[in-house]
């Protein structure tokens, strides 16, 4: 007889195809709803293309997995269950579009960011970049509304649906606060940025909506009580931070790759745990060099090479790798000592392993 974890693994292997089909149909079926005329039509096409771009779909898959782990019995093909999962993917796209405007990024999933798509449609007119950014912000807001409406329109029991919406909106507020932290910490010298502030930013900006939201919402829709939802959220926090450190390390290895001057958090002046660890473990003269390179914000090969040398010299990569593994172990210990059933614990391990496998080379986007 197959174990619950084995059955979950098999079901999750089938889930991406089910979700991708539902995602494509969702935008096809909503074409008339968003038929706002000639000016908006190409934006809806771009919106559809952006959301349906090939991605890992970590958030919807975690929601589906959590729903099953905690006893939900609807099939993964159930329309309302898929709508709940889709709400997280729409939320993710809303966040990415706004994030790309803030960072002035040009590529997302190896294709143009949304504001660059709009800019390209406008052609060579004065202010195309500004208009592209403005339109992208508004389209992001529309996706936010779509996300809320998609979750609201599920046929779960009203009490469950209302509770899910309440959690969902709280996660959005947390993400916004994390974005503010990211922006404001980016204006500070690395010497004035505390590790605790970076960890808080990671938790608010990404961990809550990427890991806690799907797992808690899936469990909630399966009927899990508030005490166990709080326990689940506490359990997820070190896992989420570990995955964010993994993202830092992946990006650093990409930073050291062939395209050394492409946009990265390091060159954009973002304050990461990797940079803070490097600063903490350098001697004073090297700290000054690191501060100088980070303050220039110029993507020239000399500054890039110096940052790389200083990070390597500090041993920060090894330190962060150790911290990441320690956080994963902390979560495992907490899971083993939790009040969840053996089957639920095994299911959560399977979910964490799935995410780790899918993100070990390219992160969580």
PLM feature spans:
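All-alpha prenyltransferase/terpene-synthase fold signal
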Residues: 1-365
């Amino acid at each position: 007889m197959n174990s619950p974890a084995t059955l979950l693994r098999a079901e999750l292997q089938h889930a991406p195809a089910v979700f991708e089909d539902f995602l494509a149909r969702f935008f096809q079926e909503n074409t008339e709803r968003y038929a706002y005329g000639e000016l908006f039509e190409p934006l809806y096409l771009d919106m559809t293309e952006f959301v349906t771009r090939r991605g890992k779909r970590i958030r919807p898959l975690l929601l589906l997995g959590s729903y099953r782990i905690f006893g939900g019995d609807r099939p993964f093909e159930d329309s309302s269950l898929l709508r709940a999962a889709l709400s997280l993917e729409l939320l993710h796209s809303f966040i990415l579009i706004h994030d790309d405007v803030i960072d002035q990024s040009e590529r997302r999933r190896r294709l143009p960011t949304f504001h660059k798509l709009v800019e390209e449609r406008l052609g060579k007119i004065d202010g195309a970049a500004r208009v592209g950014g403005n339109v992208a912000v508004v389209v992001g807001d529309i996706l936010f509304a779509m996300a809320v409406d998609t979750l609201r329109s599920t046929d779960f029991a009203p009490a469950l649906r209302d509770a899910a919406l309440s959690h969902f909106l709280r996660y959005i507020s947390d993400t916004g606060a994390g974005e503010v932290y990211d922006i404001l910490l980016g204006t500070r010298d690395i010497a004035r940025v505390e590790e605790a502030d970076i960890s808080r930013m990671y938790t608010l900006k990404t961990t809550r909506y990427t890991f806690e939201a799907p797992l808690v919402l899936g469990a909630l829709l399966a009927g899990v009580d508030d005490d166990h939802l709080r326990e689940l959220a506490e359990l997820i926090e070190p896992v989420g931070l570990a995955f964010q450190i993994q993202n830092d390390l992946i990006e650093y290895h990409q930073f050291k790759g062939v395209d050394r001057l492409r946009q990265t958090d390091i060159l954009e002046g973002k304050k990461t745990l990797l940079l803070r660890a490097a600063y903490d473990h350098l001697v004073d003269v090297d700290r000054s060099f690191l501060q100088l390179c980070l303050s220039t914000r110029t993507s020239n090969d000399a500054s890039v090479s110096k940052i790389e040398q200083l990070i390597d010299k500090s041993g920060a990569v090894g330190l962060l790798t150790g911290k990441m593994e320690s956080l994963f172990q902390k979560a495992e210990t907490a899971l083993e000592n939790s009040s969840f059933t053996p089957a639920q614990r095994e299911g959560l391990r399977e979910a964490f392993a799935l995410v780790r496998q899918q993100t070990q080379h390219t992160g969580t986007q």
